[in-house]
Amino acid sequence: MAALQEKKSCSQRMEEFQRYCWNPDTGQMLGRTLSRWVWISLYYVAFYVVMTGIFALCIYTLMCTLDPYTPDYQDQLKSPGVTLRPDVYGEKGLDISYNVSDNRTWVDLVNILHNFLEGYSPTSQEDNINCTSEKYFFQDVFGAPNHTKFSCKFMADMLQNCSGLTDPNFGFAEGKPCFIIKMNRIVNFLPSNSTAPRADCTFLDQHKDDRPLQVEYYPPNGTFSLRYFPYYGKKAQPHYSNPLVAAKLLNVPRNTEVLIVCKILADYVTFDNPHDPYEGKVEFKLTIQQ
């Protein structure tokens, strides 16, 4: 019992560890001979090569089932969201306020519109084609260069008085500002049966004079031409430009905060989703001081 309970000295422990690392009597290193180390190394190399090959084959098979022209992630909303320019946000959504007599309060708003419309200049649109039809522009084949599909031009001058060309101040200087409305893209979305969708802007709250909002729309009637639909995705239409509608507000009361809503009226566009205030419409506060 005394022999069993005898503790090994530090030198004995070190000697045993050295013999475990290399045993000259048996030729073992770390408990295995050289041939066994070679065999176990070959086993693990072969195992991981096979596992890597199986994983690569699974990824390749998965990628073959994916359509490169269909976005990986798509929203579940059936109707497109609607955005507004200029887009200045307050604590609770879009909140735009400026003073007609102080250009420092609206020069940034004008610059936002100019910068946004740079994407609709002749240079930016030179890769797109001129379209004249007012019907849907269906494309069953990739007829454009580099295995893509054609996109119709949308030029800034189509917004006429709200293009920034005839009036660089977009009406802000006279208290009749222009706002640009854009629908977000949804792949293969058709907004209506045969009638082009259009924008409709109204006061959302009541005023003491109870006058309806007077609006000039560009293009006329505030329509989004059907020739810009359907959208086939970024890879299929790399040069696609969203159609726009500009709304020039003519009778906004001064020194009063008003709430305005711009809805998209179309057969398959809804704007009554309580969970998404920007589906099918955009609301914003506007204060014009004088």
Swiss-Prot record:
Region described as immunoglobulin-like: 194-290
Disulfide cysteine pairs (residue numbers): C131-C152, C162-C178, C201-C262
Biological process terms in GO annotation: cell adhesion; intracellular potassium ion homeostasis; intracellular sodium ion homeostasis; potassium ion import across plasma membrane; proton transmembrane transport; sodium ion export across plasma membrane
Q: Which InterPro entries match?
A: Na/K_ATPase_sub_beta, Na/K_ATPase_sub_beta_sf
Sites carrying sugar chains: N99, N103, N130, N146, N161, N193, N221
* PTM comment, free text: N-glycosylation is necessary for assembly and functional expression of the pump at the plasma membrane.
Q: Which domain of life is it from?
A: Eukaryota
- Iron-sulfur is among the record's keywords: no
Q: Name one GO cellular component term.
A: apical plasma membrane
Record's comment describing the protein's domains = The C-terminal lobe folds into an immunoglobulin-like domain and mediates cell adhesion properties.
Q: What protein am I looking at? A: Potassium-transporting ATPase subunit beta
Species of provenance = Canis lupus familiaris (Dog)
Which taxonomic lineage does the organism of this UniProt entry have? Eukaryota, Metazoa, Chordata, Craniata, Vertebrata
